[in-house]
Design a protein with these regions (language model features):
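Conserved C-terminal structural/oligomerization subdomain of aldehyde/semialdehyde dehydrogenase
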Residues: 1-100
Length: 100
């Protein structure tokens, strides 16, 4: 389904039917992009298990709020690195190895 494969910016809600959790994860991951996603469930542990399987840089579980201290950035063709938190600082560092 096209809407699930494009990176859309804006207030968009897509409702897509799925057979089971494996199918839902397959649909969520079937994209060239992976900036963020969301999982809603009455069972928080189950929602977290699904969120861990999603190939996105951020996943809100049950509408979790944005955390400015958490690293932010996408997977695959989304974004250009990480912002915020220690991973955001790493974007400005270069590693050097010296052998004597």
């Amino acid at each position: 389904m096209t809407v699930a494969q494009e990176e859309i910016f804006g207030p968009v809600l897509s409702i897509i039917g799925y057979e089971d959790e494996d199918d839902a994860v397959r649909i969520a991951n079937d994209s060239l992009y992976g900036l963020s996603g969301g999982v809603w469930s009455a069972d928080q542990d189950r929602a977290i298990a699904v969120a861990r399987r999603m190939r996105t840089g951020a996943v809100d579980v049950n509408g979790g709020s944005f955390n400015i201290a958490a690293p932010f950035g996408g997977y695959k063709q989304s974004g250009y690195g990480r912002e915020n938190g220690p991973y955001g600082i790493d974007e400005f560092l270069q590693t050097k190895s010296l052998q004597l």
